């Protein structure tokens, strides 16, 4: 599943931890936005890790699920080109 994750976390320490966790699951797109291509196990693990870390009264994490058709309709204007980090072994 393709998930766009955004977060608003005022505490620097928690925000840094969330950023570090998300870097291991997807690609950092903007300051508090990641794009992740996850299977159901990865998603469950990620959601659990994030839920344990945040303070719900102060922090907000939003997850947007994009179907395969919607992924082809994503437009980008400006910014750095998205890198394909696929590794191939020959």
Feature names for model-found ranges:
Residues 1-42:
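Extended, hydrophobic alpha-helical segments
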Residues 33-59:
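Short, intrinsically disordered low-complexity segments
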Residues 22-27, 47-51, 71:
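A broad, low-specificity signal for short, low-complexity segments enriched in glycine/proline
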Residues 53-90:
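C-terminal structural segments of small proteins and small subunits
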Residues 16, 41, 45, 70-73, ...:
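A broad, structure-centric signal for solvent-exposed, well-ordered loop/edge residues
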